[in-house]
Amino acid sequence: ADKYMEDNPGVTVTLEAVPWGTCQDKVINLAIAGDPVAFSYVGSRTLKGLAENGHILETNIPASQKAMYQPGILNTVTHMGKTWGFPHAFSTKALFMNCGLLEKAGVACEGPQTWDELYSMAEAVTKNVDGAAGIGLAGKDFDNTMHQFLNYLYSNGGQVIDPMTNEITLNSSNTVETLEFYGKLANVAQEGPLAWERSQLTELFNDEKIAMYINGPWGRGQHKEGLDVKTVRIPAGPQGNQGTLLITDSVAVFSNTGVEKEAMELASIITSGDSQYSLDTDWGLTPIMQYPQIGNEAPYNEDYWMMFIDAIGDGGPEPLFVDYKAFQTVMNSMIQGAILGEGDAADLVAEAAEELEEYK
């Protein structure tokens, strides 16, 4: 921002730091009140609602910058074929395994390639290691319960909504199969999955109460020293590849500010080149750009990072809905229904797909 002001005399940029928990609501409420900020860092899940209500501008991402993104990144900010934000922070997921617990259970600490292999490894731990469960399962009323489920759905060739046509595509054999499997995992998971969200699973992993769980690249820094941990790709479902959920936060440019041109220029600078590279490396995030193209290899050339990078091509975006909170509620009640065994997976999926029509 300082360099931009230097290069553009007469332009003053005032940055305001707002806690992440309240930032989105604040900028949305200011836009509704007719007093929008010039641009803001938001969860990409909010872009569709902001776009549909005319609060943000379509982003003119230069073609050279578009070509730099990892595959699938732009799908996280795309609605009806248009991009509505500059992707700025990105995460993928992988499976963390406690080799000590797996070996105690008589299982080799090798990454499971399929869901069947994952289940049998988790079952071996649950049966053979006192006080430990095979896998951590998120089921709490929390966004990351839906996110955990989507890691499995994208690993089984499924989809929730088509970002190009806006058609709800949830009701498929891929989703039904995924939901059945997620519910089945409750048999080899920690007790009462509905009480747990992902960050709490990290604590269970550190306490050696679960042998495996899915987390982002920051997981490595949160695990206690002395654990023998292996990080591998999420296993593939019967109809898919080893996928992952692709989540981004992005910079959105608001309309009706009188400084749209300048805001668009500055947003583009902040989210590209060295500025973007330093954010990714400082925050320990999956690289959003193909950095080797600009001569930046490290730290993303080590085996650990390859687990998070290699999955990108088989990943799918966090689905965009106008009312993303309602979307999350519908998905979570479907997932919780499966964990609790409340009804047939096919019925739960059909019901959720029908409800989602209202929020797209």
Residue ranges and their predicted role:
Residues 43-94, 99, 116-119, 145-148, ...:
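Hinge/lid segment of periplasmic solute-binding proteins
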Residues 57-71, 75, 111, 134-142, ...:
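Short, solvent-exposed loop/beta-turn-alpha elements that line the ligand-binding surface or hinge
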Residues 12, 103, 187, 310-360:
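Conserved C-terminal helix/tail region of periplasmic/extracytoplasmic solute-binding proteins
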Residues 84-88, 93, 117-167, 174, ...:
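Extracytoplasmic/periplasmic solute-binding protein
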